[in-house]
Design a protein with these regions (language model features):
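Short linear motifs at protein or domain termini
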Residues: 1-111, 218-250
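Short helix-capping and inter-helix turn/linker motifs at the boundaries of alpha-helical repeat units
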Residues: 20, 118-119, 181-184
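Hydrophobic residues in alpha-helical segments
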Residues: 33, 109, 132-133, 197
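Residues at helix-coil transition
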Residues: 34-35, 156, 198-199
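Residue-level recognition of short, well-ordered coil/turn positions
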Residues: 37, 72, 136, 201-202
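Mobile beta-alpha loop/short-helix "lid" or hinge segments that flank ligand
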Residues: 68-74, 169, 182-184
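Conserved amphipathic alpha-helical segments that form helical-bundle/coiled-coil interaction surfaces
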Residues: 94, 98, 115-177, 187-196, ...
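C-terminal regulatory/effector modules of DNA-binding transcriptional regulators
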Residues: 180-250
């Protein structure tokens, strides 16, 4: 058997490595930050996080280093780790980029979407509306994020999808405190957007998406107008509950 044949056979049977514990801890902590269960400015105590997630302090420490490198956490020598508090300027800049990217996503999606895609978008809208009616912020934020992600997927542009995916978690983080304020208007705008996609009206879809994302951006800026370029004020954290990080590969 030739060496290249061995290499090809070996790659076909390669065993996937399990995700390191520190990475699973990082993912769990990132979601706690995005959902505001760990609030901006909150002091992150290693022992408390370890107890909450059911792990030792070592993967917590490693996860904090990773989150610091990604801008989710700030490490202050002698004081400890804190959830990053975003400034109004950084939120404004990211949401402006999001508006430009997703308006193009909508334009391209209108030219490619089929009946199944429209049906899925209608279901996501219904899920979001139901979450709004029962005041379920987490489900509302998730449905909103999934609508935007799916429209970008429908665009068929992999580079665009990659860029949008990079800002998606930040968008969810910024959207969570204003989801209730956006409320009914947001889901009405989503419905209009889906109508434009179904009508294969690329220009209308792009315009509605831009208006929709700009409304979200403006609501955030209006609600934080008094902050100027100061960091977002820490919100009162939710009651913490123990979360278990799986130790097996998933």
């Amino acid at each position: 058997m030739q060496p290249n044949e061995i290499s090809q056979q070996a790659s076909a049977h390669r065993i996937d490595r399990p995700i390191p514990l520190r990475e699973r801890v990082r993912q769990s902590m990132q979601e706690l930050i995005i959902s505001r269960q760990l609030a901006p400015g909150q002091h992150l105590v290693e022992s408390e996080l370890a107890e909450m997630l059911g792990v030792s302090r070592q993967p917590i420490r490693e996860a904090l280093q990773l989150l610091n490198s990604e801008g989710w956490v700030e490490l202050h020598p002698g004081y400890g780790a804190f959830v990053h508090s975003p400034t109004v300027t950084e939120v404004d800049e990211l949401l402006a980029v999001r508006s430009a990217l997703e308006s193009e996503s909508a334009r391209l999606a209108a030219e490619r979407v089929d009946a199944d895609g429209i049906a899925h978008l209608r279901k996501l809208c219904a899920d979001g509306q139901a979450a709004l009616e029962r005041d379920d912020i987490d489900s509302m934020v998730n449905a909103n994020a999934e609508i935007h992600r799916y429209i970008t997927e429908l665009s068929g542009n992999r580079v665009l999808l990659d860029f949008v995916s990079q800002v998606d978690r930040r968008v969810r983080w910024y959207y969570t405190p204003i989801a209730r304020s956006r409320g009914q208007h947001s889901w009405q705008e989503h419905a209009r957007l889906v109508d434009a996609l179904e009508a294969v009206d690329a220009d209308a879809a792009s315009r509605i998406m831009r208006e929709h994302t700009e409304h979200t951006r403006q609501i955030y800026l209006d609600e934080h107008a008094e902050d100027g370029d100061q960091t977002e004020q820490p919100a009162k954290p939710r009651t913490r509950r123990r979360r278990t990080v799986r130790t097996s590969a998933s």
